[in-house]
């Protein structure tokens, strides 16, 4: 009898399945690689392990803090980072070089209560050498704080208007002063003789401020000088106490309403018929002034 031979088909079928599985995994890897490559181009990140996630997470919080930081905090940080400002703040707080760390004890609490400051929590700023703000305030004398408060609450000067005020900062508007010609002591200056009280000494009486004395003739205002040919004639007439045409008639004190006026022209009285012809020739003539001479007061004759 012959024995049946075993089938070889099952082992061959297993080999085919193995090749198919390898091929499927290879294709899946290629597809995943292509997907990651496409996502990287679009801006996504593909991580193969979770070990790199904490590193990225540690870098992100500082960026978020900078974005969410307030402008006031930035200003305070810039002020504190500057060395000159830090020194000024230390001087304001009244710290000394020999002071160490602040000792939190009951003795400090009792001393603060004795000084008049209420109980508070001790605070330390700008390093360990800086004392507590409330303690430094209590150590200062009250006069200094009162002076500062008075300066902060001082009233504005006249002519200033407050436009904007925030805390100690104040924006004021100063009005322009137009009295530039005044001195610092407030007395105005005289720019011209005619504008103020300053007048020439000679023109005070001519303006009407003074009046002639009693018993004297009125003041005569002379006109421009006559030519030399008529100078002798006018001089002789003045010695005879007559008023020529070259003099302006004035009023006497005794008769203010009337004026003694002598007109020697063709319209006035003509003492002699040949006067106009002689004056036209330029010859000096002696006038016949009988009846035209004014009677002066006795005191004027004595002068």
Curated annotation (Swiss-Prot):
Q: Which family does it belong to?
A: Belongs to the RELT family.
Q: What does this protein do?
A: Induces activation of MAPK14/p38 cascade, when overexpressed. Induces apoptosis, when overexpressed.
- Look up the domain of life of the source: Eukaryota
- UniProt lists compositionally biased (Gly residues) regions at 194-212
GO CC terms in record: basement membrane; extracellular matrix; plasma membrane
Q: For bias kind Polar residues, which ranges apply?
A: 274-295
Query: Which Pfam family, any one, appears in the UniProt record?
Result: RELT
Membrane-topology annotation of the record:
Single-pass membrane protein
> Which UniProt keywords are listed?
Cell membrane, Membrane, Phosphoprotein, Transmembrane, Transmembrane helix
Report if keyword Transmembrane helix is assigned.
yes
Gene Ontology MF annotations: collagen binding
The record's listing under PANTHER family reads: RELT-LIKE PROTEIN 2, RELT-LIKE PROTEIN 2 RELL2
Q: Which gene encodes it?
A: Rell2
Modified sites of kind Phosphoserine: 52
Q: What is this protein called?
A: RELT-like protein 2
TM spans, by residue? 15-35
Q: Which GO terms describe its biological process?
A: positive regulation of cell-substrate adhesion; positive regulation of p38MAPK cascade
Q: Where is this region: Disordered?
A: 47-68, 135-214, 249-303
Q: Where is the composition biased (Basic and acidic residues)?
A: 148-158, 172-188
The subunit field of the Swiss-Prot or TrEMBL record says: Interacts with RELT, RELL1, OXSR1, PLSCR1 and TRAF2.
Q: Where in the cell is it found?
A: Cell membrane
């Amino acid at each position: 009898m012959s024995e049946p031979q075993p089938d070889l088909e099952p082992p061959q079928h297993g080999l085919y399945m193995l090749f198919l599985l390898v091929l499927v995994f290879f294709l899946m890897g290629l597809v995943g690689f292509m997907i990651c490559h496409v996502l990287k181009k679009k801006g996504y990140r593909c991580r193969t392990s979770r070990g790199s996630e904490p590193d990225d997470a540690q870098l992100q919080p500082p960026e978020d803090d900078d974005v969410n930081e307030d402008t006031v905090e930035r200003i305070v940080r810039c002020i504190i980072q500057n060395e000159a400002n830090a020194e000024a703040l230390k001087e304001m707080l009244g710290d000394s070089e020999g002071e160490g760390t602040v000792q939190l004890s009951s003795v400090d609490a009792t001393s603060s209560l004795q000084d008049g400051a209420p109980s508070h929590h001790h605070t330390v700023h700008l390093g360990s050498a800086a004392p507590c703000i409330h303690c430094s305030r209590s150590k200062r004398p009250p006069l200094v704080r009162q002076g500062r408060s008075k300066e902060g609450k001082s009233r504005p000067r006249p002519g200033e208007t407050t436009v904007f005020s925030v805390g100690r900062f104040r924006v004021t508007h100063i009005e322009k002063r137009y009295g530039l010609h005044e001195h610092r002591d407030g007395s105005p200056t005289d720019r011209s003789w005619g504008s103020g009280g300053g007048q020439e000494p000679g023109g005070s009486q001519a303006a009407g401020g003074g009046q002639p004395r009693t018993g004297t003739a009125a003041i005569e205002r002379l006109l421009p000088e006559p030519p030399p040919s008529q100078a002798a004639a006018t001089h002789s007439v003045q010695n005879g106490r007559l008023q020529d045409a070259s003099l302006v008639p004035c009023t006497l004190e005794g008769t203010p309403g009337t004026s003694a006026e002598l007109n020697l022209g063709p319209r006035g009285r003509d003492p002699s018929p040949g006067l106009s012809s002689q004056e036209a020739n330029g010859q000096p003539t002696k006038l016949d002034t009988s009846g035209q001479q004014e009677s002066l007061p006795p005191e004027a004759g004595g002068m």
